[in-house]
């Protein structure tokens, strides 16, 4: 039984976003015993309940106010939104932020021997998909008439099984398409995981907890996207060194014992540091260059 005084968060029980969602909560310091058999898990150190459900149930649970927050792929969220609007409903929710995992794309794919010259080639054909509403919106915008073959899994086998001429499915690497004799021909939607909140009045205590959680999530994502950089550099090259690190805050400059011509620099950079950048730093006279991951970060 759920305690309505506790913050309720829905997340995928198993699948593409499950592990990353659990890792995000753990890095936010939320201690949860996620036993594989339990559909409801309780945080040990915060008044939070986790509902572990199918991913396509999460948007509805948030829109209907059953849970307070949901971690869901934008593709699933948008599909549910379009479905409800087509049924005459006016669903609402609040997107709190995009997350830094779950990147994928919803694409049209056709058999490798199909002579694809553009989306017009799909006019009056049969397309298998688990996302009929996203597919319809895209092809309606292109003026394409098609027949939809709704499948809830194994969409990629539809052309080989004679169920459809082509498919519209999620693609991450394209390996599954290739294994089934298909080629990606058109990207119709790009998606990442996102955190959403139910619309409507929220208890002040719950809202304060959501604000705390958002601060932690922001810190976790910022830490993953940032690096702590330490190096020694000539005093007369400081601005050139800083210019190679766009996104970095102004560095901390420390004197080096016994060397008046060089200093130690410490800084946080939000940019990916490639080997080429490190080589350029070295060419400017920098040495002892260390690039370290950041576990937690708060501005």
UniProtKB/Swiss-Prot annotation:
Q: Which GO terms describe its molecular function?
A: ATP binding; ATP phosphoribosyltransferase activity; magnesium ion binding
Q: Which GO terms describe its cellular component?
A: cytoplasm
Q: According to its UniProt record, which reaction does this protein catalyse? A: 1-(5-phospho-beta-D-ribosyl)-ATP + diphosphate = 5-phospho-alpha-D-ribose 1-diphosphate + ATP
Regulation of its function: Feedback inhibited by histidine.
UniProt subcellular location: Cytoplasm
Name any Gene Ontology BP term. L-histidine biosynthetic process
Matching InterPro entries: ATP-PRT_HisG_long (IPR020621), ATP_PRibTrfase_cat (IPR013820), ATP_PRibTrfase_CS (IPR018198), ATP_PRibTrfase_HisG (IPR001348), HisG_C (IPR013115), N-reg_PII-like_a/b (IPR011322), N-reg_PII/ATP_PRibTrfase_C (IPR015867)
Cofactor list:
Mg(2+)
Pfam hit, one: HisG_C
- Presence of the UniProt keyword Transit peptide in the record: no
- Assign the protein's first listed, main location to one coarse class: cytoplasm
Q: In which pathway does it act?
A: Amino-acid biosynthesis; L-histidine biosynthesis; L-histidine from 5-phospho-alpha-D-ribose 1-diphosphate: step 1/9
Please provide the record's keywords in A-Z order: Amino-acid biosynthesis, ATP-binding, Cytoplasm, Glycosyltransferase, Histidine biosynthesis, Magnesium, Metal-binding, Nucleotide-binding, Transferase
Q: Specify the enzyme's EC class, one word.
A: transferase
This entry's Enzyme Commission designation comes to 2.4.2.17
Q: Which PANTHER family match?
A: ATP PHOSPHORIBOSYLTRANSFERASE (PTHR21403:SF8), ATP PHOSPHORIBOSYLTRANSFERASE ATP-PRTASE (PTHR21403)
Which family is this sequence assigned to? Belongs to the ATP phosphoribosyltransferase family. Long subfamily.
Protein function:
Catalyzes the condensation of ATP and 5-phosphoribose 1-diphosphate to form N'-(5'-phosphoribosyl)-ATP (PR-ATP). Has a crucial role in the pathway because the rate of histidine biosynthesis seems to be controlled primarily by regulation of HisG enzymatic activity.
Q: How does it assemble?
A: Equilibrium between an active dimeric form, an inactive hexameric form and higher aggregates. Interconversion between the various forms is largely reversible and is influenced by the natural substrates and inhibitors of the enzyme.
UniProt name for this protein: ATP phosphoribosyltransferase
Taxonomic lineage of the native organism:
Bacteria, Pseudomonadati, Pseudomonadota, Gammaproteobacteria, Enterobacterales
